[in-house]
Amino acid sequence: MSGSYPFIDIAALDSIREGFAKGDAQLVLTHDLSAVLWVNGPGAKLFGFDRVEDMIGGGLDLPIATRRQIASSNSNAEGETRTVSVRLGGGLRSDLTRFSVSHITLPDGVSGLLLTADGKDAEAEDIISGLSDDSTHIALIDANSRVIAASPRFAALDISSTTLEDLVIEAADATDRIVKRRIRAGKHSVPGAIARLTDTPPMHLLCIIGDAPVATLEAPAALQGEAEEILEEILPEPVESANTEDASTDQQKPRSFVFEQDAPPARFIWKVGPDGTFSEISPDLAATIGPNAADVVGRRFADVANVFGFDPDGSIAALLDKRDTWSGKRLMWPVEGTDLRVPVELAALPVYSRDREFTGFRGFGLVRPAEAEKDPEEIGLVLAGGIPQARKPVSEPVETATPVEDDDVLALGEEVANDDSPVATLPKPPLDIAPTPGRRESDKVISLLNACAEEKVAADQARMLKEREREERPEGGLTKTERNAFREIADRLRKQGLANSRAETETVAISDEPVIDSSQPVEKTEVKASLIDEVTADEASLPSSGMAYGDETALLANLPVPVIIHSGDKIHYVNQALLDLTGYESLDDIRGAGGVDVLFNSESDDGETRQGMVLRRANGSEEPVDAHLNAISWREGRALMLSLMPVAAAPVSVEAVAAPAEAPVAIDKDDEKQALADHVEELKTILDTATDGVVLIDPEGRIRSMNHSASALFGYERDETEGKFFSMLFAIESQRAAMDYLHGLSGNGVLSVLNDGREVIGREAKGGFIPLFMTIGKLPHTRGFCAVLRDITQWKRTEEELTNARKEAERASSQKTEFLARISHEIRTPLNAIIGFSELMADEKFGSIGNDRYRDYLRDINRSGNHVLALVNDLLDISKIEAGALDMQFEAVSLNDAIAEAIALMQPQANRERVIIRSSFQSNLPDIVADTRSIKQVALNLLSNAVRFTAPGGQVIVSTSYEMNGDVVMRVRDTGIGMTKSEVEQALKPFRQVNALERRKAETAKDWRSEGTGLGLPLTKAMVEANRAQFAIDSTPGHGTVVEIAFPPTRVLAD
């Protein structure tokens, strides 16, 4: 399919794929609406095209108002969607289609406009309609690898269910949802791609590029029989030749592979599954060593190695079992049709799925034909079934030839079998254009179905057969230009109106030539010699270097349909039918008169825009025409082929003929009024469907009308509000604001530009009140206004609930803080007494205790009291931080000095625990903006935790640094027991202690009361964040913990 982008790449984009799977009509346009970049089948059908390739790359003929409506969506921001209503169709009947217009970014970064129309009741066959052709096959695949819908010739590819399952799995693992590779189809592999469109339920789009087997392309019985009847009528007597049978045999015999030993090294890609079965090999290997020798897809590597005699020691098979990356493995591969074998170097990489499941190996290979050596087993001869034929030189003359008539008959049969349109609707042309497969386009034979033409064809047989070996025709017999031309003829001649409107013209044109009776033998038909001479002169006039170009124009020149080939405003070619219709003598006359612009005029003399396309003749007269546009290949580039068909005139009644000249004008005006009334009725229906209330206001502030939603919103009937002031719809406190808003818009002031709406309170007919959001706009012609009112009751209720929830949370936090403050005062007094008396008794100032056990009890009482006091202080601090009431005095703080003081305080405890504290401070470290007391508290907490959870003999390292990005960083590293990720998360929650504490207790037999309260790390983190710094912790069980506190550059007082 044509277009600047692969079709499946666009279909897999996130903004397109789900709508594509639903059957929505979609097309992508350039921002200036000049070209169609992409379209799906329903989108092409919506605009009157049967195939998407006929629409992609061409322009879109839209009315000026529609273009302006769509182009207005260019101002939308990325991701925003705007709904526009577009009237499609022409004449007296047209449909109003609603499109969603949004911006889309294509794979190469180009931005375009995406138009989407809802696909109502779309079937699976509708989704893939218009996508397939002779060489493109489409299918929809579900999650179970079943075919939901497929193009007519997809089944002929013979793709197995296992292959489809592999494609579905690969598409699920692909990050961009697309997989492109060669796919096993029967005994061959063809290029294809699969895209995952949706996830729930999964749906996949599969595209295959390749021709289906010939046996599956048979025509229906009806067409086959009709084609055979036509062949029997036009087939001339066969030309007897002694070598006919030999030539036919040579044509049917397949081409043998020829090994080129002097070819350069070739690279190829290969893939095997988890069981060692080849699943893919690129065609480069088959092109070098032969298709039979490279046909190993679906076979295990061990079996192939056993048959071909390579990898005797099983080293490569062992590497495939290890699932490791390997390279540099060399083996000798037999060459098809020879007694040689060539060295092949292989390398492979293991492939895993998204779930880390092993899916096989992907690798590349290097074939070196120049290093071929003798194969003692001569396996290559077995692969080809014997010694291959030697290659014949291109310049070898052809002594015998197959009759051209046989080729023409076969070509015509193939065209009839492959024609998509019904043969019965096509009138028989006076000339039979019969392309011959395998022949150059410049060597077509125009069979005139008479004896004289047969002699002319027989005389040119030798020349055509010699040039047949130089250049082959495309498969199918016709070029793309010819195929488009024939398809255009079929589409146009199928219409019944053409036969009625042109019956008389064709009769006159054909009457000058003898009528050929199909019941008589071809040999008895007489043709004027001048016609044969004209054909001979036309063939002789074509230059040898441009035979293909002359042949295209010769074909188009004989079409009965007016055709224009152009690119933009430049006309490349027009045929004789168009010159006859317009009255111009030549193409140069059309170019001199103004080109395309002078041929088509969309406005009448009075300035009114017409609905259809009108062709203007050279004498100034005009004729309405139907047009069909196709994108084709022309010369060495791309162009547009515009085919025209005059619109059949409607039958005129006797009353219309007898009526005066003014009657048609009156009828047109009545139709125009009716169409305008219908349009107004549609707009009213749209307004009544909207959920927002719409009120129309006159310049004096009185209500003109309102839609159904506004009537239901306020509880008024329409008649009750007409002519009354707009302020009656609002509560007293909002009436002034509403009227000020209205007057501000009428004055063309700032409000007319910055129109952001108002929140007002509406008043119902029964006296109730409604919170509303109102937006007013000016009407262009009547100087009135349009007010759009939206009920925001639910929004207000949600806002009130959120406000109440916030107040409740603040009240609970305040109560908690107040409770902790009271508790702290109540607990501190007895705690201070307990701690003081325990210290006094331990000093034995009033006498000796006399027992060491009592002294231990006093130390325990003192330590427990201090522990409870620290707990109360921590609770009070963390509650203040959560409430935002912590008293912070920000000033310049020397981080090195603060940490040094904390180390000095913790040094005695570290000595008792036999833990070494080391420091590494950066010199000239800039000061930071922080609270001095909280920074010292943070350092003490971190050092206390590090010493507490480090075994004797361990180390605690405290360091500071000034980073390149301007951060001042403090790090505390220990060699303690460490924590897992889950334990770190638990330790950062208040009142939570990790399970490692119990292990620590069992290992060191420490008192559990010295293990902390679970507030150390949460309080430290809260204080760090209160100082506008960042807190990070990294810990590994058995290796220790690293706590990092980073002060950003905004908190650093650098010089």
From Swiss-Prot:
Residues 419-439 are annotated as: Disordered. GO terms for cellular component: cytoplasm; plasma membrane. Its main location: cytoplasm. InterPro entries: HATPase_C_sf (IPR036890), His_kinase_dom (IPR005467), HisK_dim/P_dom (IPR003661), HisK_dim/P_sf (IPR036097), PAS (IPR000014), PAS-like_dom_sf (IPR035965), PAS_fold (IPR013767), PdhS_histid_kinase (IPR048231). One of its GO terms (biological process) is cell division. SUPFAM superfamilies: ATPase domain of HSP90 chaperone/DNA topoisomerase II/histidine kinase, Homodimeric domain of signal transducing histidine kinase, PYP-like sensor domain (PAS domain). It is found in: Cytoplasm. It holds the Pfam family PAS_9. Residues 822-1051 form the Histidine kinase domain. Residues 1-626 are annotated as: Important for polar localization. Signal peptide: none annotated. Residues 627-1055 are annotated as: Interaction with DivK. Gene3D superfamilies: 1.10.287.130, Histidine kinase-like ATPase, C-terminal domain, PAS domain. Its EC number is 2.7.13.3. Keywords: ATP-binding, Cell cycle, Cell division, Cytoplasm, Kinase, Nucleotide-binding, Phosphoprotein, Transferase. Residues 679-750 form the PAS domain. It is an enzyme of class 2 (transferase). It comes from the Bacteria. GO terms for molecular function: ATP binding; histidine phosphotransfer kinase activity; phosphorelay sensor kinase activity. The modification Phosphohistidine is found at residue 825. Functions as a polar differentiation marker. Essential protein that, by localizing in the old pole of dividing cells, controls cell division and maturation, probably through control of DivK phosphorylation status and cellular distribution, which in turn regulates CtrA, a transcriptional regulator of the minB operon. The asymmetrical localization of this protein is probably required for cells to enter a new division cycle. NCBIfam families: histid_kinase_PdhS, sensory_box. Interacts with DivK. This is Cell-division control histidine kinase PdhS. It comes from Brucella anthropi (strain ATCC 49188 / DSM 6882 / CCUG 24695 / JCM 21032 / LMG 3331 / NBRC 15819 / NCTC 12168 / Alc 37) (Ochrobactrum anthropi).
